[in-house]
Amino acid sequence: DGEYYAFDIIGLQVINQDDVVLGEITEILKTGSNDVYITKAKDGRQILIPALKKVVTEINIEDGFMKVIWDENQEV
C-alpha cells in the first residue's frame, strides 16, 4: 500500500487542498532523498512537488488525480 509505479503517477491531475487543479504530472525526478513530481501547469509553468506524505495527501489512480497541500502560487 502506498507504492506506485511511475506509469501510474504520470498523467495524474494534481489538485490542491482548495480543489484547484494545479496541472498534470509529466515526469518524476528521482533524487537521493525523495522523488519529485514535475507538474505542468495550464500556463506552461513547471511545478516541482516533492513526493512527501506531508505534501501528498491522496493518490487516486482510478479517478486520475493526486491531492496535495500546495498553494497554487507557491514557488519551489
Model-predicted segments: where are they?
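Peripheral interaction segments used for macromolecular assembly
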Residues: 1-76
